[in-house]
């Protein structure tokens, strides 16, 4: 057996804390809390009653309130509304921790990743969605030039799950390009030539690929950063992603990768493009990570519960300052 990865070890620690928090016996937790109580809470009931009566006879109202808070048990405290919200704060924090743990475990268990050399036009099955590398384009900036991958992420319909194999939509889809302000020349292999002049595949004056407008057989897309959501009559839902690999003029050996990310409430899709050639294919990585959104929600809820509990503690000790 090999060593555990850092993520698996982290999940194990989170599970241990989860069991320690929720599955310990009630008596054990009650005894632990009793050891941390203030010393004046262990007074005899008769002695506590005498202290309360004597404190009420004093004229200093602030001191009487503080003494009442210190003398009475927590379930009888009526000074301020924040003291009754302590169980609610605890539930928010523990609920956030549970959601965070669930997001970490499910995202690791349901993760789907493909890394390898892919020829143009090949189709990948990523769970219920399909991914196709439609083409490779070139982009030129002021200090760099880059190769830009053109990925299609779609969900096939239930009636025709193998849509590309049974009709002629795949060749048309692979060769389709944005038309507004575009001047594209293809050589039959599904990629455009080097952009020149004011009009090219990237739109007027070298506009970024993710901001390009619609396809000949589609309606106006919903444009977002790094990907474009489109509509198609044969697909239930599909979008395009444009990862880049940039090479800088100052140092040709230095290259950076721009990841295309698509995020929703349930799944995050990541697409990366590497080196390759049109004859052998291009190295690409497509990652599907579900339930990442729940990690953020759990972290926010746990932080909110901790802040509310801290505010309650500060309000509690403020009575002594007055």
From Swiss-Prot:
GO cellular component terms, semicolon-separated: mitochondrion
Biased composition (Polar residues): 184-195
Protein's cellular compartments: Mitochondrion
Region spans: Disordered: 174-207
Superkingdom of this protein's organism: Eukaryota
InterPro entries, sorted: CcmF_C, CCMFC
Alphabetical GO biological process terms: cytochrome complex assembly
Transmembrane segments: none
Protein's recorded name: Uncharacterized mitochondrial protein ymf2
Organism: Marchantia polymorpha
Lineage of the species this protein comes from: Eukaryota, Viridiplantae, Streptophyta, Embryophyta, Marchantiophyta
């Amino acid at each position: 057996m090999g060593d555990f990865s850092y993520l698996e070890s982290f999940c194990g620690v989170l599970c241990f804390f989860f069991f320690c928090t929720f599955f310990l016996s009630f008596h054990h937790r009650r005894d632990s809390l009793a050891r941390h109580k203030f010393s004046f809470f262990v007074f005899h009931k008769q002695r506590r009653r005498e202290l309360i009566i004597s404190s009420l006879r004093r004229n200093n109202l602030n001191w009487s309130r503080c003494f009442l808070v210190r003398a009475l048990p927590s379930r009888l405290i009526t000074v301020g509304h924040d003291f009754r919200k302590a169980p609610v704060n605890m539930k928010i924090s523990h609920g956030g921790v549970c959601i965070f743990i669930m997001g970490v475990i499910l995202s690791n268990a349901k993760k789907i990743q493909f890394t390898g050399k892919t020829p143009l036009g090949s189709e990948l099955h990523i769970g219920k969605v399909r991914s196709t590398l439609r083409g490779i384009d070139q982009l030129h900036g002021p200090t760099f030039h880059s190769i830009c991958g053109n990925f299609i992420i779609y969900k096939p319909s239930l009636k025709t799950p193998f849509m590309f194999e049974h009709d002629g939509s795949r060749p048309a889809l692979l060769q389709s390009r944005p038309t507004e302000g575009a001047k594209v020349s293809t050589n039959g292999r599904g990629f455009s030539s080097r952009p020149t002049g004011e009009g090219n595949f990237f739109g007027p004056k070298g506009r970024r690929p993710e901001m390009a407008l619609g396809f000949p057989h589609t309606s106006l897309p919903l444009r977002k950063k790094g990907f474009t959501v489109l509509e198609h009559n044969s697909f239930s839902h599909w979008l395009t992603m444009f990862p880049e690999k940039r090479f800088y003029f100052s140092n040709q050996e230095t290259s950076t990768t721009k990841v295309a990310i698509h995020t929703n409430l349930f799944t995050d899709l990541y697409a990366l493009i590497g080196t390759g050639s049109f004859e052998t294919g291009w190295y690409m990585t497509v990652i599907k990570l579900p339930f990442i959104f729940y990690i953020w929600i759990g972290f926010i809820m746990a932080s909110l519960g901790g802040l509310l509990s801290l505010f309650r503690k500060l309000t509690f000790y403020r009575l002594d300052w007055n």
